[in-house]
Amino acid sequence: QFADVSAKADVANFNNFFATTCAPGEYGDGNDASMNNAPQIQVLNASGIGYTKYYYINDAVDAEENPVPGNCWANQDGFIATNSDALDLAKGFWFKSMTDGTVNCSGQVSATGDRGRTIIADQFNIVANAYPVALSLNSAESTDFTPGEYGDGNDASMNNAPQIQVLNASGVGYTKYYYISDAVDAEENPVSGNCWVNQDGYMATGTQVPVGQSFWVKSASAGTFTFSL
């Protein structure tokens, strides 16, 4: 199944920081079923429409079409991924493998306390936990978002509020959080200001996004989602 993964380091390309023990596929003549069955990464395009795909194969070539020794990440034409295939910090991506294995991310961890992502209006944007620690959504500064309201729980404004969906640990279903202006705490005392809440309107506490996890953000209006640790 697809797993949403995050980059916690400023990286040049997948071959610099993303290693896996999953069995590689082969490019072959470009029509080999092994290519489609190879471990793959999908990165949402900047436009928010479509994905760029990379495959983990054992017969990649470089730009001059010389064979690349060993297994590596390659584009859909079988050429090894290069620095032009850079992945931005805090940008999430999908990973899928037909075989079990482990994945390891390595690289320079960002020393910047604040890290933002631009959110395209009215569609789901994949965002990554950019830090080597679990993330509390209410430690983030969500700017330019128009909050919704919980109201009586049936208010249309709740469903129209900016929302975050985090894939459950089982890989099945999502836990949803909403950005609203009338949250309450566990004792049902009103919370001052806007914050992220669970689906029952209670302020989210603790951590919601594990290390290495990506999540989806959707808002009716464009804005920025800024981490602040």
Residue ranges and their predicted role:
Residues 141-212, 216-219:
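DUTPase catalytic domain/fold
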Residues 24, 34, 39, 44, ...:
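Intrinsically disordered, low-complexity proline-rich tandem-repeat tracts
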Residues 50-89, 175-208:
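A cross-kingdom feature marking solvent-exposed beta-strand/loop segments within repeated
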Residues 1-37, 45-47, 81-160, 208-229:
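A short, polar beta-strand/turn micro-motif
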